[in-house]
Regions:
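N-terminal membrane-targeting/pre-transmembrane regions
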Residues: 1-50, 150-158, 168
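Non-transmembrane, membrane-adjacent beta-strand/coil modules in membrane-associated proteins
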Residues: 2-13, 88-155
Length: 179
């Protein structure tokens, strides 16, 4: 029997707000560059509104690319099947074989709060990447909210996830691990 269950990873209100603010900040240089280019190309005769410099053009290209890549690497959801737990992302999905999972449980309260981000993002489309926290050590987060999280422990790595219906997620995964 090939069971497969999908759990969404939806952004909470705080993440939605911070993502919106950062998106405006990242995309503003691209919009300004387009505006100045348009004004320069189609401005009134005899009026020279100026040209965007190479730095602004580079920034205008890099910042939207950063926004796209950050979104593409954010967790969209989690798939549990008979063989693997898959962290669904547009770029570089993460596969954790069920045979490597030693424990699944509700995450410690506030595990993400106060953590040191070693590599990844905190508050722009998610909380994902490599983190460290005193009393926890290094862990990998692939979450879209700060509460109702789940810890997945393998022999080498601790994962922190944010599936919808965390209790059901833990039960479904736990049942497969006991087989």
């Amino acid at each position: 029997m090939n069971m497969q269950k999908y759990y969404k990873a939806e952004m909470d209100r705080l993440l939605t707000i911070t993502t919106s603010i950062v998106s405006v900040i990242l995309l503003a240089p691209a919009a300004l560059t387009a505006f100045f280019w348009y004004k320069n190309k189609f401005g009134q005769a005899g009026v020279s509104p100026g040209r965007p410099g190479a730095e602004l053009l580079l920034l205008a290209a890099l910042l939207p690319a950063t926004a796209y890549i950050t979104r593409a690497m954010a967790p969209r959801g989690y798939v549990i099947d008979d063989i693997n737990l898959l962290i669904d992302r547009r770029i570089k999905p993460i596969t954790i074989p069920l045979g490597e999972i030693k424990e699944v449980r509700p995450a410690r309260d506030g595990i993400l709060k106060g953590s040191l981000r070693l590599m990844g993002t905190s508050g722009y489309y998610g909380y994902y990447g490599l983190f460290w926290k005193r009393g926890v050590g290094k862990y990998r987060a692939y979450a879209t909210r700060l509460s109702e999280l789940v810890e997945i422990k393998t022999e080498k790595t601790l994962f922190v996830l944010s599936p919808e219906n965390p209790g059901e997620f833990i039960s479904s995964l736990g049942a497969l691990l006991r087989r």
